């Protein structure tokens, strides 16, 4: 019985970890000021690719940096 309860809790935790919310803080870099939408796209892209080197600062092709805060829900 204990095993069943632990298994259910673990399964629920794994299901919730599939949903991640990306919040960002744009940072100025190289005379460019990215929008929140551009940062979200850059951060989400880095997160989806599992590129941990680009988190928390996701660098994209337009040469700007964004602070990415990944919160799992």
UniProtKB/Swiss-Prot annotation:
Protein name: U-scoloptoxin(15)-Sa1a
Coiled coil: none
Organism: Scolopendra alternans
Tissue: Expressed by the venom gland.
Similarity remark: Belongs to the scoloptoxin-15 family.
GO cellular component annotations of the record: extracellular region
Keywords, ordered alphabetically: Disulfide bond, Secreted, Signal, Toxin
Extent of the signal sequence: 1-20
Single GO molecular function: toxin activity
Localization (cell): Secreted
PTM per Swiss-Prot/TrEMBL: Contains 2 disulfide bonds.
């Amino acid at each position: 019985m204990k095993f069943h309860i632990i298994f259910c809790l673990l399964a629920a935790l794994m299901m919730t970890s599939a949903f991640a919310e990306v919040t960002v803080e744009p940072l100025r870099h190289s005379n460019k000021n990215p929008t929140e939408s551009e940062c979200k796209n850059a951060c989400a892209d880095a997160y989806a690719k599992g590129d941990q080197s680009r988190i928390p600062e996701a660098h994209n092709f337009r040469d700007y940096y964004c602070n990415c805060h990944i919160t799992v829900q």
